[in-house]
């Protein structure tokens, strides 16, 4: 079943394939007189990895918040599968150093209904050896894995990750993206990744959407987006011969088109 999150009176029900998790059509968000998202179309399906790239302020995080139901004030149509379970890993997570807490205690603070998969989530995220460590003493990569484990407690259909590789070195990025691929394959979930840099896009990405000032400039496989004139005009000053996209295995897919 595919349930409508929000539907203006004049709009019809969104059709959806059995594998569709979330879908947006003509999505527009404004803050006062300022547009944040403009006429965005997007579909995320089970087992698919979709990455949103763009500079700061391009609307990436707002789009994720609308798709996951956090923001409900918008125009256009957004639908999601009935009973959709969402796991979210934020970019920033503040830990109060005056309130020491172990990883084990942090994991068990989850809502009671989500504790049934506690051991499984801990194992899948690779944090079993961290359970007795204080949260305040974790490295950036360790903290990301703990937050991922917590997001897995609900066995999500959709996993949303906001800048998961930010602040990690190259080795840490590779380890994190391998872990995300493992989770995607094991759970069969869709994955929505936010990034400001196409060069950090994970190898398993099926589709990249490049946003700027709330508009989709282009979309497609990582290589096609990186070669697109709109993308190069936006990031060209930062592109050089040393930059490269992670190796990408992709079957026949759509090329880069204007949103």
From Swiss-Prot:
GO terms for cellular component: plasma membrane. It is a peripheral membrane protein. Residues 22-238 form the ABC transporter domain. It comes from the Bacteria. One of its GO terms (biological process) is response to zinc ion. It is an enzyme of class 7 (translocase). The keyword Cell inner membrane applies. It catalyses: Zn(2+)(out) + ATP(in) + H2O(in) = Zn(2+)(in) + ADP(in) + phosphate(in) + H(+)(in). One of its GO terms (molecular function) is ATP binding. Its EC number is 7.2.2.20. The keyword S-adenosyl-L-methionine does not apply. Keywords: ATP-binding, Cell inner membrane, Cell membrane, Ion transport, Membrane, Nucleotide-binding, Translocase, Transport, Zinc, Zinc transport. It is found in: Cell inner membrane. PROSITE patterns: ABC_TRANSPORTER_1 (PS00211), ABC_TRANSPORTER_2 (PS50893), ZNUC (PS51298). Gene3D superfamilies: P-loop containing nucleotide triphosphate hydrolases. The complex is composed of two ATP-binding proteins (ZnuC), two transmembrane proteins (ZnuB) and a solute-binding protein (ZnuA). Part of the ABC transporter complex ZnuABC involved in zinc import. Responsible for energy coupling to the transport system. This is Zinc import ATP-binding protein ZnuC.
